[in-house]
């Protein structure tokens, strides 16, 4: 009995076989007429006849209406369909247009399909012959009843029947619907030539759901018999054949198909058909695939867990191997869960020598690698991509209904027993009724379809379907690859529950935390024992040296000299015998900086850090702002000389060079003796500041975790001052005293790469678990794919979920750090998720963190931000917020940032400003109501006083703010970007540019438009920003038609390649021409269009190549791609000369010290963005003087933005400075100290520069 086809791709023809695109829609065509070599078509609508039609344009087979089975088996993302949609709002009726499916929101099918299908409408409709077509960015939601499936001719055609084509076939691509493809075009050519030579009229039409080439005669009206022509091929020659037929005697194919399907469906109950593995891609069949309970009746079949067991192996393959082996694989994003926990962590061993140990209740993994493909891998930087290392730990098989003890019959299951049984079974010819081994029966019992005839299904299952698709080799250890299967819904839930239960058991198994004093005493004992052991070894070695005779010492010295003469060059440092012996016995290194080597021990010559890893030393004479609120004065011990004490100004905060870090052995510095030497002065003070705020004191005996004075704090150090390394050092020491606290580090996507490199660079012993975002994880999985042989292969989404759960479990099991991006955190914290594991991970992230670290914590500062709301729900008050630019735009955002870092700040503000709240000792209200109340008081009292024009009132507001915040804010304002005087220097110039004639005309028109609005409309601001760079850029915006007519846009469009029409463009080209041979240039821009334009200009003018001399860094690049671009630009000797970067994509957390010239093409509303962008180049590691050019267009909105930005920067300085800050207008001076800039200005003949000012406050050289 034949099996019933669940889905059929071929379909009978519609009564109207073709459709034609006209009047903005696809209209059905009754027939195509060929007469005298001319083709005409007749439309079904009103019987219109269109003459001289070419079959290559706007004509195709008619699309068929989608059915319920299409939603189940055919429709998927990235296929083209025809949809019924109202293009314009003023249209009376919807029209049929082509579109592409973006995504499908699946819903259960009951009486009809209720799935929501997101599609994008093509812009160029009817152009099915074009290879490249434009498509709308915005998607629309439609239903199944609005979709038609595209059709093409079936590959088989008739040669001896009255019809030429019997079926059409479903088509997924718009390109493949062309009639010029396949065998229809030669037929059409034959009919056209025949109609001319023989004067015969043909009609291509549908007769009883079949397409015929009908011959039109005068006798058709009087006779029921029709004539058609068919074409046959004999000996390579096409011959025509005329066939007469009666339409009434022909059976409709649609009825034929229904009868056939009904016949195929009712099979004999004794016949058990083997499970057919679907060959479709990206589709899940709409069948019942799992059940967690026993069915009420025995009728029908229930799919159980489809496990196939063989020699299980984990193969790491390249992308090409994955594509070849997975040609029919399922890449849907639905949750297909593997038995990944059945595998042991992969080890790098030889496949022929791998002998894994036998374990009870586990399946042994044999590691195999494919040898082919050598030489195809490109060499990549080790740190350019964050590696993905999947780790799978074994889970007992009993959790999935498999009895591991039954394998082999003994108490344990060995690899040899398993493979001996399988080889014995496979070596025999498998026939029906053959007796199976006990192990095979167990496997079949777990793999079977449960039903009334399951015993017969065992006997009638063929051995071919259960065997490997790979041929058997002589090597018995060679792994076998089985056909891919997927887990049922019940197995998926069990696996997820197992992971979550593991986390719960890990949390429950944690012992009660010991007191800080007990933990400290235990650490001291451990360190004392280790030190005592080292001293004993040292004494023994010294005793041995004393007993050595003088002759032996001479011989040893001579051997060392001989070896040195062969190994060392004359200019290398030679290590004496005493230092060599000290190094062998465990030298207490005293590192000194050697400019050619790095951090080198002066005792034994050991190199601690190479010169490439050594940061430039920070200057000591920097202002250090720290208050003593909630901190005892006795905790800060200073050592001042007599002269310094006499000259100290008590109205100012103590100089950082005057306050030295505590050196007592009974404090937290004893926890990180090696890292302490690598911290700069300001970092050491911040280290103690963190301990006082988070734990209460630097001395463990004085720490009280229940104290009300401890809480969140802010590290506001200048960009590039080493905040990341400071936090790494603090976490290393913190976890030693508080191992039960689970630190969670959240960072922007761009800085995750920096965090990862820092942990590797400093060799931190604390385990770090990095949770990738979904897209980044899938990209890593493509680069290094893990293939599961013989078990269900998971989808990428499932692998990501398992990876997150596994890392969270390890985070709970051992003292470690969990690092993730803000985007991933927001995704996992969604409360409206329908998946139980998502809700569980959100619960864990809210309740488990004992310490929350927020890198670049000023980003989630909006009151309505979903990220900020999620962060406020994390149940810990111990938080550390890192920011180089704490004050952003206004005091409302500043208040939100402080509340995020220190939730107690809300109560502190209310106690200080709300007399009613202070009298009642707090009011029991909802947290968000208290926050709104505190925010209102903060803005009405403090912010208004600081914004006031009266100096005394402003000073009063600043003092109130400092009294409330200085206790938990540690501010470090180094020179320039915080890198200190050791850096070569920084010069910042503001260039006010005169516009060209065409620029002036455009900008004047746009400035007049602004006067009609209240505020600054975004569209007008965008147009002004683009026009100030180059006039042609206004045409790159979609809103340009609102301000310019078509004639003006046409004239502007001709200026694209004329660089002289833009004053900023001319300055960039002049600067690059003068410095390109010896310096690299970093160009920041807010929009993408200028980046693309400059790329084309550099290619045309300098003959550079994109990706070689020209590099771009924009927001659409994934994390690992950004890392590659940064490493390429920073690599010494790389041919890259210019990096065009989006200021939003790389303004924070990355190092671009290869550039010594920075150009800011447009101004920003937020001064912190400009400051962060400058800090990408002016930071530790910079070897040259950095020149920054801020370009402004005279008399435009850019000048207003610059003045507003300067005021915000002044307010920020007033908040964090103890001294009076001068008027910001005095920061600028009209002078030029840059030789290159002076040369450009001297040669300027068109007077492009209106004013050039140097920022004296921000510049250091």
Curated annotation (Swiss-Prot):
Compartment(s) where it occurs, according to its Swiss-Prot or TrEMBL record: Nucleus
Amino-acid positions noted as binding ATP in the UniProt annotation, renumbered to this chain: 717-724
Gene Ontology terms: biological process: gene silencing by siRNA-directed DNA methylation
Residue ranges annotated as motif DEAH box: 855-858
One matching Pfam family: Helicase_C
Entry similarity comment: Belongs to the helicase family.
Name of the protein in question: SNF2 domain-containing protein CLASSY 2
High-level lineage: Eukaryota, Viridiplantae, Streptophyta, Embryophyta, Tracheophyta
């Amino acid at each position: 009995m034949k099996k019933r086809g669940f889905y059929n791709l071929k379909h009978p023809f519609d009564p109207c076989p073709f459709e034609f695109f006209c009047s903005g829609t696809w209209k059905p065509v009754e027939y195509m007429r060929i007469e005298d070599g001319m083709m005409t078509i007749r439309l079904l609508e009103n019987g219109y006849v269109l003459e001289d039609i070419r079959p290559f344009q706007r004509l195709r087979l008619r699309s068929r209406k989608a059915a319920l089975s299409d939603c189940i088996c055919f429709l998927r993302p990235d296929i083209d369909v025809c949809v019924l949609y109202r293009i314009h709002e003023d249209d009376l009726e919807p029209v049929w247009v082509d579109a592409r499916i973006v995504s499908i929101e699946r819903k259960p099918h009951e009486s009809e399909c209720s799935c929501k299908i997101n599609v994008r409408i093509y812009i160029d409709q009817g152009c099915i012959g074009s290879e490249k077509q434009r498509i709308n960015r915005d998607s629309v939601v439609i239903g199944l009843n609005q979709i038609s499936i595209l059709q093409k001719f079936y590959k088989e055609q008739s040669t001896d029947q009255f019809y030429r084509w019997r079926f059409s076939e479903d088509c997924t691509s718009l390109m493949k619907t062309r009639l010029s493809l396949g065998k229809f075009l030669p037929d059409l050519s034959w009919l056209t030539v025949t109609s001319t030579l023989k004067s015969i009229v043909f009609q291509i039409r549908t007769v009883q759901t079949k397409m015929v080439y009908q011959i039109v005669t005068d006798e058709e009206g009087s006779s029921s018999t029709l004539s058609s022509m068919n074409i046959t091929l004999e000996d390579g020659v096409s011959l025509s054949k005329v066939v007469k037929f009666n339409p009434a005697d022909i059976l409709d194919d649609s009825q034929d198909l229904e009868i056939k399907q009904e016949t195929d469906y009712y099979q004999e109950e004794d016949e058990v058909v083997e499970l057919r593995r679907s060959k479709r891609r990206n589709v899940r069949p709409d069948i019942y695939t799992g059940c967690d309970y026993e069915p009420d009746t025995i009728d029908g079949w229930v799919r159980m867990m489809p496990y196939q067991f063989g020699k299980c192996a984990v193969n790491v393959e390249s992308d090409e191997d994955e594509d070849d082996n997975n040609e029919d694989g399922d890449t849907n994003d639905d949750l297909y869960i593997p038995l990944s926990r059945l595998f042991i962590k992969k080890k790098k061993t030889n496949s022929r020598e791998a002998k894994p140990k036998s374990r009870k209740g586990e399946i042994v993994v044999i590691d195999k690698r494919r040898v082919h493909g050598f030489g195809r891998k490109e060499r990549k930087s080790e740190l350019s991509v964050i590696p993905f290392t999947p780790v799978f730990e074994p889970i007992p098989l009993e959790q999935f209904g498999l009895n591991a003890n039954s394998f082999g019959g003994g108490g344990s299951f060995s690899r040899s027993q398993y493979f001996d049984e399988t080889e014995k079974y496979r070596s025999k010819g498998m026939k029906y009724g053959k007796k199976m081994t006990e192990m095979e029966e167990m496997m079949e019992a777990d793999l079977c379809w449960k039903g009334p005839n399951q015993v017969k299904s065992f006997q009638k299952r063929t051995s071919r379907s259960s065997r490997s698709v790979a041929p058997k080799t002589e090597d018995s250890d060679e792994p076998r690859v089985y056909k891919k299967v997927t887990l049922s819904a019940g197995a998926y839930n069990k696996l997820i529950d197992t992971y979550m239960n593991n986390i719960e058991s890990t949390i429950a198994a944690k012992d009660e935390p010991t007191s800080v004093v007990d933990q400290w005493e235990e650490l001291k004992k451990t360190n004392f024992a280790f030190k005592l052991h080292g001293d004993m070894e040292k004494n023994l070695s010294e005793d041995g040296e004393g007993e050595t005779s003088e002759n032996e010492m001479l011989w040893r010295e001579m051997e060392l000299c001989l070896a040195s003469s062969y190994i060392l060059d004359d200019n290398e440092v030679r290590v004496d015998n005493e230092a060599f012996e000290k190094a062998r016995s465990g030298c207490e290194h005293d590192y000194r900086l050697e400019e050619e080597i790095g951090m080198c021990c002066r005792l034994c010559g050991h190199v601690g850090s190479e010169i490439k890893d050594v940061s430039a030393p920070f200057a000591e004479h920097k202002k250090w702002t720290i208050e003593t609120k909630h901190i005892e004065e006795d905790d800060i011990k200073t050592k001042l000389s007599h002269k310094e004490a006499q000259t100290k100004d008590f109205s100012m905060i103590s100089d950082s060079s005057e306050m030295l870090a505590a050196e007592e052995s009974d404090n937290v510095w004893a926890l990180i003796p090696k890292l302490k030497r690598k911290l700069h002065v300001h970092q050491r003070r911040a280290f103690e500041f963190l301990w006082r705020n988070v734990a209460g004191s630097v001395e463990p005996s004085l720490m009280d975790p229940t104290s009300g004075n401890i809480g969140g704090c802010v590290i506001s150090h200048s960009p590039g001052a080493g905040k990341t390394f400071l936090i790494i050092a603090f976490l290393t020491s913190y976890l030693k005293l508080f191992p039960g606290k689970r630190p969670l580090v959240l960072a922007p996507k761009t800085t995750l790469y920096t965090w990862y490199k820092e942990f590797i660079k400093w060799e931190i012993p604390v385990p770090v678990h990095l949770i990738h975002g979904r897209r980044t994880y899938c990209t890593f999985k493509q680069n290094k794919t893990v293939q599961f042989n013989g078990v269900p292969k998971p989808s990428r989404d499932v692998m990501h979920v398992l990876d997150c759960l596994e890392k969270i479990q390890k985070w709970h099991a051992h003292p470690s750090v969990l690092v993730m991006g803000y985007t991933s955190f927001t995704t996992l914290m969604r409360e409206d998720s329908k998946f139980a594991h998502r809700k569980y991970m959100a619960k864990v992230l809210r309740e488990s963190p004992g310490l929350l670290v927020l890198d670049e914590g000023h980003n989630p500062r909006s009151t309505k931000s979903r990220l900020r709301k999620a962060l406020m729900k994390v149940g810990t008050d111990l938080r550390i917020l890192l920011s180089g630019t704490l004050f952003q735009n206004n005091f409302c955002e500043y208040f939100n940032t402080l509340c995020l870092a220190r939730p107690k700040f809300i109560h502190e503000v209310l106690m200080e400003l709300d007399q009613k709240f202070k009298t009642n000792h707090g009011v029991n209200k909802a947290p968000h109501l208290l926050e709104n109340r505190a925010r209102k008081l903060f803005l009405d009292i403090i912010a208004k006083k600081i914004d006031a024009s009266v100096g005394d009132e402003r000073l009063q507001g600043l003092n109130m703010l400092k009294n409330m915040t200085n206790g938990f804010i540690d501010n470090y304002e180094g020179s320039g970007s915080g890198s200190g005087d050791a850096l070569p220097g920084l010069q910042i110039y503001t260039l006010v540019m005169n516009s060209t004639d065409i620029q002036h005309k455009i900008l004047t028109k746009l400035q007049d438009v602004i006067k009609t609005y209240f505020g600054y409309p975004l569209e007008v601001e965008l147009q002004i920003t683009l026009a100030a760079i180059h006039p042609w850029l206004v045409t790159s915006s979609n809103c340009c038609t609102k301000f310019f007519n078509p004639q003006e846009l046409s004239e502007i469009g001709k200026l694209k390649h004329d660089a002289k029409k833009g004053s900023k463009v001319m300055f960039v080209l002049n600067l690059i021409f003068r410095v390109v041979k010896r310096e690299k240039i970093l160009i920041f821009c807010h929009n993408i269009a200028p980046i693309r334009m400059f790329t084309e200009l550099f290619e045309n003018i300098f003959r550079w190549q994109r990706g070689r001399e020209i590099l771009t860094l924009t927001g659409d690049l994934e994390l690992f791609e950004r890392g590659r671009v940064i490493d390429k630009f920073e690599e010494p000797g790389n041919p890259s000369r210019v990096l065009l970067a989006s200021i939003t994509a790389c303004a924070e957390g990355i190092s671009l010290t290869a550039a010594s010239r920075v150009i800011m093409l447009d101004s920003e509303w937020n001064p912190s963005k400009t400051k962060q962008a400058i800090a990408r180049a002016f930071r530790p590691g910079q070897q040259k003087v950095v020149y920054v050019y801020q370009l402004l267009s005279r008399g435009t909105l850019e000048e207003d933005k610059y003045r507003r930005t300067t005021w915000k920067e002044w307010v920020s300085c007033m908040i964090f400075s103890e001294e009076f800050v001068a008027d910001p207008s005095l920061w600028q001076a009209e002078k030029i100290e840059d030789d290159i800039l002076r040369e450009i200005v001297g040669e300027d003949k068109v007077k492009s520069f209106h004013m050039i000012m140097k920022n004296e406050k921000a510049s250091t050289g």
